[in-house]
Each structure stands twice: as structure tokens, then as C-alpha cells.
């Protein structure tokens, strides 16, 4: 299948975004929009990530990252970088990368009732 009109960018969300299920909500939103890429907690207390998809869905996700997030999050600002148009997708789906400063697995599945302790 030929892929065209794929846009991508990196993002970093600042504010109270760790320990409030931000990554899990970002995963759900990205999957709902058909976006691909990843997100993860950073050692700086932010959530970083990469998204790729069609421009209209990318715009919706960027607005969600700026204004919505998870119910308990408090977003101060979002920085977008490395915005470009691509020939094809680089990822098969959207996923949560393991937390660099924790030593436990991250559950990526939606609706998993056994992972409520995840500190996103």
C-alpha cells in the first residue's frame, strides 16, 4: 500500500504529567486517531514522544496535548520539534516506551484491569 501525506513531529509536555496516567491517555487518544509513534516519561519530569499520521489527525492530537491530557494532569506547555513530511510510516502503531527511571514493565494494552497501579 502506498503511503503519502504522512507528517511527523516530536513533542515534550511540561507540567504535572507524570503519575497522572498521562501516557495511558495519550496512547488511547493516538490510537483513536490512527496515529503511530510513542511516548515516555523523561527523567526531567516531562512526557516526551513522537507522533506520525495524517495532518488533520496530527492537529487534533497536538491540540489534545496542549489542552486536555489526562483528567489529573496540569499542562503548562508543550514543545513540538522536528516537524516534517514523510514518505512512509516509521512505526506500526503507537506505544508507551518503558520509563527510564523505573524498573518495572509498562502495560500497553487498553482496558487492562490488572494495571491500575501504573504511575504514568
Curated annotation (Swiss-Prot):
The keyword Flavoprotein does not apply. SUPFAM superfamilies: Acylphosphatase/BLUF domain-like. It holds the Pfam family Acylphosphatase. Its EC number is 3.6.1.7. Disulfide bonds: none annotated. One of its GO terms (molecular function) is acylphosphatase activity. Keywords: Acetylation, Cytoplasm, Hydrolase. The modification N-acetylalanine is found at residue 2. It catalyses: an acyl phosphate + H2O = a carboxylate + phosphate + H(+). Optimum pH is 5.3-6.3. InterPro entries: Acylphosphatase, Acylphosphatase-like_dom, Acylphosphatase-like_dom_sf, Acylphosphatase_CS. Residues 96-107 have a biased composition (Basic and acidic residues). The keyword Hydrolase applies. Residues 91-120 are annotated as: Disordered. The active site is at 23, 41. Residues 8-98 form the Acylphosphatase-like domain. One of its GO terms (cellular component) is cytoplasm. Belongs to the acylphosphatase family. This is Acylphosphatase-1.
Amino acid at each position: 500500500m502506498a503511503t503519502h501525506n504522512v507528517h511527523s513531529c516530536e513533542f515534550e509536555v511540561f507540567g504535572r504529567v507524570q503519575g497522572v496516567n498521562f501516557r495511558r491517555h495519550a496512547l488511547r487518544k493516538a490510537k483513536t486517531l490512527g496515529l503511530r509513534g510513542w511516548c515516555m516519561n523523561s527523567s526531567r519530569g516531562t512526557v516526551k514522544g513522537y507522533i506520525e499520521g495524517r495532518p488533520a489527525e496530527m492537529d487534533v492530537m497536538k491540540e489534545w496535548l496542549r489542552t486536555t491530557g489526562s483528567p489529573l494532569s496540569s499542562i503548562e506547555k508543550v514543545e513540538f520539534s522536528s516537524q516534517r513530511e514523510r514518505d512512509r510510516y516509521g512505526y506500526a502503531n503507537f506505544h508507551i516506551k518503558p520509563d527510564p527511571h523505573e524498573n518495572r514493565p509498562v502495560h500497553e494494552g487498553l482496558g487492562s484491569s490488572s494495571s491500575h497501579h501504573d504511575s504514568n
